[in-house]
Amino acid sequence: MDLKNLSILIVDDVKTMRSIVQKMLRNLYIGKTLHMAENGLEGLKILHSTRVDLAIIDWQMPVMNGSQLLEAIRDDKHLRDIPVLMISGESEKDIVLEAAEIEVEGYLIKPLTPAVLDDKIRSIIHQIHHPDVATLHIRKARTFEEAEDLASAIEHMKYAAILKPKASRVLRNLGLLYQKIGNEKNMEKCLQKAASVNQQDVVTRHLLGEMYWAKNDLISAARYYLEVISLTKKFTDRAVLLGEALLDKNVIRLAKNIFSKIISKFSKDLSIIEKILDICIRQNELEYSKIILNGLIRDFPSNYDLIYKAGVVCETLGEVDNALEYFLTVEKHQGRRLDVKLKIAKLFYDKNKIIQADNYLNIVLRKNPNHKEALALRRLF
């Protein structure tokens, strides 16, 4: 295809960036028609309404980002063969891995130069119009799969795997075809081979983790999920649930390994770490909960809900002085909380400091004369 006659879609939320790419393409004499969109949703509307030979998509955008747009393109039978050049301002591993897994034809990091853009577009268009034999087999496999001729699909994917023995995606897709015909043994072999030839193939490792989890082989599932966590944040919610399942089965060391790896990856993400913390408290893993809380309180010293939880954990462990210190800290900053005052009263009672306990009980009962827990504690005096 003549590069001058291409219909190109440029999707970027920054107007100046769209203009820069447009100017570069004009100077390179690439593209006859240039369509512009400021987010993925607008870009998708253009793709559905007009012919596009190449899409140049920014990764980070509002409304619908580049990853979501790319996934929508690949999931649409009418759009999926459009070549995509992904552009990002970051070189983060997660972005590179995700772009590779959703089958992007090219990936560039800003700032762009005309020479690099020219080389990448020429390479993409050449690949599209001069596919290798393995790619032709992959396309035939897809056609047969959609026609529900799975036997033929498997044969063509096997040929592709022979021609590209180091292509983990081909091996993975072959495994998924075996899964469709109920051949789990061959599926497992293909996925394991895919994982072995590509140490960065996070999707295959995720599939293996899920497969072993479904078989209740939690140790094998955990082994693959530990690798997944090292590579990406994408499947974190599932990894947290697997950690909880491991605690349920009393496989404590592996559960802690998973949780610790997630926490190190999300060191500033309070919501994820609190989720893990709450699981550990529910499962009575209190010493590990203390370790998590110490880290959180160090990073979020004004989060008094965390300090309160630390008090509860220490109280449960029988560490009365530590618990009292935490609750007194909360009470100093959130003096209206009756639950905290009651905790302090109980701990003073445990320390046989009846006068201090009585003082805090009186405060609770003045606010709520019918407070059942406070009245029950008073009867112990």
Predicted regions and their residues:
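Receiver (REC) domain active-site loop signature in two-component systems and cognate sites
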Residues: 61
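Alpha4 helix (beta4-alpha4-beta5 surface) of REC/receiver domains from two-component response regulators
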Residues: 68, 91-106
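Two-component/phosphorelay signaling modules centered on CheY-like receiver
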Residues: 15-35
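Helix N-cap/capping motif at the beta->alpha junctions
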Residues: 36-45, 66-69
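Active-site beta3 strand of CheY-like receiver
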Residues: 50-57
